[in-house]
From Swiss-Prot:
InterPro entries: HOC (IPR038998), Ig-like_dom (IPR007110), Ig-like_dom_sf (IPR036179), Ig-like_fold (IPR013783), PKD/Chitinase_dom (IPR022409), PKD_dom (IPR000601), PKD_dom_sf (IPR035986). Monomer. Interacts with the major capsid protein; one hoc molecule associates with each hexamer facet. Residues 355-359 are annotated as: Interaction with the major capsid protein. It holds the Pfam family PKD. This is Highly immunogenic outer capsid protein. Capsid decoration protein that binds as a monomer at the center of each major capsid protein hexamer once maturation and expension of the capsid has occured. It only has a marginal effect on head stability. Dispensable for the head morphogenesis and phage infection. The keyword DNA damage does not apply. It is found in: Virion.
Amino acid sequence: MTFTVDITPKTPTGVIDETKQFTATPSGQTGGGTITYAWSVDNVPQDGAEATFSYVLKGPAGQKTIKVVATNTLSEGGPETAEATTTITVKNKTQTTTLAVTPASPAAGVIGTPVQFTAALASQPDGASATYQWYVDDSQVGGETNSTFSYTPTTSGVKRIKCVAQVTATDYDALSVTSNEVSLTVNKKTMNPQVTLTPPSINVQQDASATFTANVTGAPEEAQITYSWKKDSSPVEGSTNVYTVDTSSVGSQTIEVTATVTAADYNPVTVTKTGNVTVTAKVAPEPEGELPYVHPLPHRSSAYIWCGWWVMDEIQKMTEEGKDWKTDDPDSKYYLHRYTLQKMMKDYPEVDVQESRNGYIIHKTALETGIIYTYP
């Protein structure tokens, strides 16, 4: 019978650093001899001469040939030899690497302000290396391949941040590991505009022209500004930054402007400012020259003056044109006489003005209305 040897197990598989045991089983040997065994892996001799061989699997991964040569040494005659081989498939180890992104609960961010994130591996093999990919809302961020990520948000809302690492290590299968997902709340930017009024307050005579101009500072360059105005807490017309004050009545007013400032990437802001208005009665400008003499009539609490009809005509014409005959048109050649009449009306409870056309006596009531010859 021919001397043979067999190896078990047949075509096994294992993982690097795992120990596999092989057993050589002889048959057909001549009796009375001593059998020894020589083991080799890929033709590299291994220690031990026993029928069992424990082999710690080494990298790199792939197939390795296990060979045993059995020698039966006899007391008489030459030795008998037999050999056998088998193939073992060696696989890489499996990683247990994990990946975490910090901060896991970041503070709210602001559009345009960078937020820093860091990805850290854990339980990775010694000597492992990694490349990184960062994602915002499931879209990969180009050019970001490091373990740190500086994210500058461009829109507001809740952003989902995560990292994927490709981890490689000797004797291990490559691993793609995904981190925890971090939620980052991004707020719009805050602005601090101010509104002022020019002038800060107004003090004018009745019917004089007066305007407030609203000026907004501290707003972004691209900001849109809308205006609204109030007079004594009641809305009035006007949507620009200029407001024309109603000076038709003597008294005081409080004018308030509200400016609403909006800009892309900013929270809108509404700012207000108030200005005080004082409207005083018109004061007739004092003319050059000597005023006509007014005759006091103390027994009647009145005063008398003669006045040319041409002055009366001018008073009535100005009234019909909507002018104030007491103060308007100070360059008129009859202004000296009109000034005298209005002063006389202030100085005396009643007046007796005799016009020259008909000799009529005109009293204060008619002069106040400005209708001398044609009564309404």
